[in-house]
A protein has these predicted regions:
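Hydrophobic alpha-helical connector segments
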Residues: 91-137, 163
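A structured, mid-to-C-terminal "fold-capping" secondary-structure block
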Residues: 181-230
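Helix-turn-helix
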Residues: 34, 38-76, 80
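Alpha-helical structural segments
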Residues: 33-45, 76-94, 101, 105-109, ...
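N-terminal intrinsically disordered/low-complexity leader segments
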Residues: 1-30, 195-203
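Hydrophobic alpha-helical bundle segments that form small-molecule/ligand-binding pockets
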Residues: 138-187, 224-227
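Short alpha-helical functional segments enriched in proximate histidine and acidic residues
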Residues: 42, 113, 145, 223
């Protein structure tokens, strides 16, 4: 399998496919791609809390039972959405040969895409990649890059999992409240932590989540880089 191609421009828009008339699609176009398009449209309007199979059926102008001819559950629809979103994760730098920069680009892109879709993370974190073509294309590109960089084959998947675990947690951090580490009335009993939080605030970073992500990612790169063959 060849490496994934350049990431499309809009990671949160409709899935690629033939354009249709404005308005609800006819039942004749109901397929997995059409379901993915409608699911993204519904999520964009109502968020994940408003995403139900009944609401999706209304968006598609079909009976709920018609959906189940193509997907067996809401989870299956989320799998389709996840696979579509994964196609917007940028893995093109792995073709250039600079492993560290490729991992940086991949990790930042991965985090940015899924920071807007954190309700999917508990699903995809335990989701088999079987029959998810865009997800598998991403992993193939990353694995090929790791292999070319001199990683022992048996270390490639554990290294990817380690980085992904960090990415998924960091995606939540992007939308965390600014006062998440405010110790409040317990400041006196947690002086070291409170001082560290205050010192970070004094740095005046616009995006503290980016500071943490950069620090953690560079530490991962340094540690994992030691596994590469000389």
């Amino acid at each position: 399998m060849t490496a994934a191609t350049s990431a499309p421009a809009d990671p949160h828009g409709p899935a690629a496919g033939p354009r249709r008339r404005a308005g609800r699609p006819a039942a004749a176009v109901l397929d997995q791609n059409g379901i993915t398009v409608a699911a993204l449209e519904l999520i964009g309007k109502s968020g994940y809390d408003g995403f139900t199979m009944a609401a999706l059926a209304r968006t598609l102008n079909v009976a709920p039972s018609a959906l189940y001819n193509h997907v067996s559950s809401k989870r299956d629809v989320l799998v389709l959405v996840q696979d579509h979103l994964t196609s917007f994760v940028d893995v093109t730098a792995f073709e250039a040969g600079d492993w560290e920069q490729a991992v940086r680009d991949w990790a930042w892109s991965y985090r940015d895409v899924f920071s807007k879709h954190t309700p999917l993370i508990p699903v995809i974190a335990v989701l088999p990649v079987t029959d998810a073509p865009k997800t598998l294309a991403m992993y193939e590109a990353v694995s090929a890059g790791f292999s070319r960089a001199g990683f022992p084959q048996e270390r490639i998947v554990p290294a990817i999992v380690a980085i992904e675990s960090f990415i998924f947690g960091s995606a939540y951090d992007v939308t965390a409240p600014a006062d998440i580490f405010d110790s409040g009335t317990m400041a006196a009993s947690t002086p070291h932590f409170t001082a560290a939080v205050q010192r970070l605030a004094e740095e005046g970073h616009d995006k503290p989540a980016d500071v943490a992500f950069r620090l953690g990612l560079e530490a991962l790169l340094a540690g994992l880089g030691a596994l590469r063959a000389a």
